[in-house]
């Protein structure tokens, strides 16, 4: 008879990220009836609950919580890993990949002016910013960084804010004034990457107040794909999906492995790549291009599975082949068919990195007529066949780091 485990999950559940993470945990344990889950608040990490549970998945928000959990000697998966403790297993999103994805997205849209908007002294914001800046500087660009005002005793982040568990820093009026000044002074058009969707909604709201067009003057990209912020902004916000569902699933898998092992549990670490960018109107802009160009690009992205050709794009936008090709060469430096091929490869790479989908299904999903044709084209573009890329790139969903 299998041993029964009582598992405590202490994760905030007010945000979409937290709820998706919890869903991932629940999905993993759904077919494991010997594992009973209890959803707790961080404040409920007490001597009694520590005794009652065999393992923990939590966001460790302070040293007191860390000490209490460590003293039990029980398996713990820290689901934030900003200042990791060597004795615990950890699960974290790939902050560097998020910043890199944002930079590459804006570069693909041919922006030359860039900005970053985050928080003061908040680790996840700093890590995303650093990767964003590094990629742009490698391409010869110098992004403008918004630096929130220093307000003694008022906008220093609390432990919860440091972990991204509350909505923004203190001193909101002063912050809004400084952010408005920063937005006004940015060279236009500009692409602004925000460390999360709450910050992106701040920028969108202030752009409206300043009569700055989004995305024509200011393109905005957030992180977390939180429907409350993304769908209630006008226009709706594009956002990077960190794949909280996969993070929760991986955290549960880590804990279950340790609970099920008869050997002393060795701390493990996993880093999960972002799922990708959820495109909405706030980044639907290509500086210097005619109005129909963004529609053409969206059409290519949305119809890639159908195996579309350049002729389909010409028909969709309603302009001549000569005109459309001339604009594509001017804006992107490539033909329409070359852009279609690049979008296909980019989509395939994303699926190979972030899913366990069979390669034949990836070929179909990205519009290739056969797995052989897909493999040949992918190898020509990337230098490796799809299977080798999956092994040498970021493994799907669960990169282990011992």
PLM regions: where:
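Short, positively charged patches
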Residues: 60
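A secondary-structure capping/hinge motif
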Residues: 328-336, 376-389
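Bacterial carbohydrate/catabolite-sensing allosteric modules
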Residues: 1-55, 63-316, 325, 330, ...
């Amino acid at each position: 008879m299998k041993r029964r485990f009582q598992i405590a999950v202490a994760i905030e559940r007010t945000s979409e990220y937290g709820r998706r993470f919890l869903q991932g945990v629940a999905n993993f344990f759904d077919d494991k009836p010997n594992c009973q889950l209890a959803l707790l608040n961080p404040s409920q990490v007490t001597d009694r609950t520590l005794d009652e549970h065999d393992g923990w998945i939590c966001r460790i928000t302070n040293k007191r919580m860390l000490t209490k959990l460590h003293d039990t000697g029980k398996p713990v998966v820290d689901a934030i890993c900003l200042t990791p403790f060597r004795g615990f297993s950890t699960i974290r999103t790939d902050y560097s990949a998020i910043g890199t994805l944002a930079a590459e997205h804006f570069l693909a849209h041919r922006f030359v002016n860039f900005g970053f908007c985050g928080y003061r002294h908040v680790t996840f914001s700093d890590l995303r910013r650093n990767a964003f800046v590094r990629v742009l500087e490698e391409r010869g660009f110098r992004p403008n960084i918004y630096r929130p005002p220093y307000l003694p005793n008022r906008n220093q982040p609390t432990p919860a804010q440091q972990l991204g568990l509350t909505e923004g820093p203190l001193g909101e009026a002063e912050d809004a004034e400084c952010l408005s000044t920063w937005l006004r002074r940015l060279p236009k058009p500009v692409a602004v990457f925000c460390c999360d969707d709450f910050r992106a909604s701040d920028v969108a709201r202030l752009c409206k107040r300043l009569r700055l067009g989004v995305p024509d003057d200011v393109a905005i990209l957030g992180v977390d794909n939180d429907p409350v912020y993304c769908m209630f902004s006008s226009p709706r916000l594009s956002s990077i999906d960190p794949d909280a569902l996969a993070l929760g699933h991986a955290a549960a898998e880590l804990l279950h492995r340790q609970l099920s092992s008869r050997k002393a549990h060795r701390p493990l670490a996993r880093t999960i790549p972002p799922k990708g960018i959820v495109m909405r109107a706030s980044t639907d802009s290509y500086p210097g291009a005619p109005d129909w160009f963004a529609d053409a690009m969206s059409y290519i992205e949305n119809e890639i599975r159908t195996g579309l050709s350049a002729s389909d794009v010409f028909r969709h936008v309603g302009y001549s082949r000569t005109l459309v090709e001339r604009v594509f060469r001017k804006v992107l430096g490539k033909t329409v068919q070359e852009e279609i091929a690049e979008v296909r490869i980019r989509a395939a790479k994303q699926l190979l990195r972030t899913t366990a989908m069979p390669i034949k299904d990836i070929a179909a999903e990205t519009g290739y007529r056969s797995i052989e044709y897909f493999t040949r084209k992918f190898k020509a573009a990337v230098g490796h066949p799809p299977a080798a890329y999956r092994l040498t790139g970021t493994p799907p969903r669960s990169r282990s780091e011992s």
